[in-house]
Amino acid sequence: MKNKPTCYDVRGEIPEIYSGVPTFLGLPKVTEEEIDGHDVIVMGAPWEGICTTGSYTGCELGTKTIRSASIRYGGYLPEFDYDAFDYISAGDFGDAAHFPGDSAATFDSIEKKADAIFSRNKRSLCFGGDHSITIPMLRSLAKNFPGKRIGVVHFDAHLDNMPSFHDTEPLARCCPMHRA
């Protein structure tokens, strides 16, 4: 079962990112040194920044929740008799460190973790976190692929294109597309 996540083996032990939290789809947990052995690297950005909705929403719990839910799935699409893991190898690189109340330090952490992936010309799947995690991911892409066009496909109920939140917070969740 080369390149297959452990969820394909019903008797397999599911790797964990940290205690009680499985890797995405049961993929192997990878260190920075192991990134080169994979085509796609998953990373998390568990961040909830400036609250713009009246109360906090739990965005920082997204990485745990997505990973926990993903363990029920794999890469096989029965409608097409297609298994993505016949063609790619993927690993879970864990979460970027986050610093509650400090957008700049958190974004720096996310960008550095993304740099470890993109500097090796690997593809990434990043989940978080509130909308603002888009900013450090795009910064890393731009830095690691200079002169290349970077496209953003944005699915949301609103555009997230405010220049700042109440003229004080340019890194709020309502602002990433303004910087894209």
PLM segments and residue spans:
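Conserved alpha-helical scaffold segments that buttress catalytic/binding sites
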Residues: K2-A180
